[in-house]
Amino acid sequence: MKISEKKFNLWFNAFILVGMLLAVVVTNVYKFQQPGARHFMLLLASVGALTGVINTVLSANGNILTFLFGLIDVTIASYVAFDSSIRPGGDPVWGNFALHAFYFLPMQFVGWWQWRKRGASSKKKVRARRLDGRQWAMLSAAFAAGTVTAYLILCAVGGSPETEGFIRTVILFDALVLVLNILGQVLMSLAFMEQWVVWILVNIFSICLWGGKALSSPDSSYTVVMVIKYIFYFLNSLNGLRIWYGLSRGER
């Protein structure tokens, strides 16, 4: 029996949202019992994780309300990254903090404005489009140059002789996530289908970044929620690529 597009999206979105809710509840129950668990940070990261998933589900479906939930998500993510960077024993993720606080946050308003110009509303999907060859070349060049620049800057700011090998690995993933998020947000705001290729990479590197933090800093209880969050983001980004491929067919 063939499942309709509308029904598939409904069930997939429900799976992502319900699955994320259950994962957060189970994680909280477990982590609250651990000695030294930081309850406030755990709950805050959980709220951010849930609003972030709603944000990405709406984005995958071309709904402009994605920017409302995105505003909540990036505000919380900014605080989580800041706390991780300044807390004694925490890992420096200043690139992640700068990304959310000084770029992602204002870009929610830019994206809302741009999607409105392309016909999006709470009931009408945005008119998606695709990159041409020249735009792909520009995107690739920006990624290469941005990654090298971000890595060198973050190494200079966050390098540590005592833990150089581990810290520099964290900084590499931090730089990759930083640059990919910047490029992905631009593509998202301008309604390009190829944003989802970028988001898939962002989610893979983010899982590695926060997974490494969870293993190296067991007292950072909220990092587990961040790992789960990006796993669901990854699944949703695959569906987003599928949906936007159809939305952008024949568009430039």
Q: Where on the chain are the PLM-derived regions?
A:
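C-terminal transmembrane-bundle signature of multipass membrane proteins
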Residues: G184-R252
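Alpha-helical transmembrane segments of multi-pass integral membrane proteins
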Residues: L99-W115, R127-C155, F173-L180, G184
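Hydrophobic, ordered structural segments
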Residues: I72-R118, K124
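Membrane-helix interface "capping/anchor" motifs
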Residues: I54-F69, V186-V198
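Short, hydrophobic transmembrane alpha-helix segments
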Residues: V25-R38, V57-N61
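N-terminal membrane topogenic signal
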Residues: M1-V18, G133-M138
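Helix-coil boundary and interhelical linker segments in multi-pass alpha-helical membrane proteins
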Residues: Y30-F32, Y79-N96, A156-E164, A214-V224
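Membrane-embedded alpha-helical segments in integral membrane proteins
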Residues: I16-F32, T75-S84, G146-A156
